[in-house]
Structures are given as C-alpha cells and as structure tokens.
Amino acid sequence: MFQPDKQILLEIVKNQMPFGKYKGTLLCDLPVSYLEWFLRKGGFPEGKLGIQLSTVYEIKSNGLDEILWTLKKMK
C-alpha cells in the first residue's frame, strides 16, 4: 500500500510548481491531466520535485483528495 512521507505531504500543500504552464500553482492544486502529461512525456522530473509530483498524482488518481484538503486547512 502507498505510504507517502509526512514531510512530502506537508510540502505539496505549501510548495508551488516552479515552471511550465502551471508555474506558481500549489503542487496539490495541479490537475491530474497535467500530471498525466508528465507520465506520457517520460515521467516526472528527477529529485524532490519528481517525488512531490508523483505523490500528488498517486493521491489524486486514487480518489484521496480529502487528504490534501485536510492538510491545506491545517497549514
């Protein structure tokens, strides 16, 4: 079962997309279609951003958006 890192969860509700069409958008607010685009183009970027984006994708694609909403309220 997918178990995201607690620190990563906190980061995805605070950090913004640093480039591209959704530059400045909170990572947790990125649409699934944009995350799927990364996958079609060969995958998420390397490093921490890639881990954050893949975490957002896993949460959203499995219908667990409530996790993100709860964390956003807490920040």
Where are these regions (language model features)?
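DEDD superfamily 3′-5′ metal-dependent exonuclease/proofreading module
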Residues: 1-75
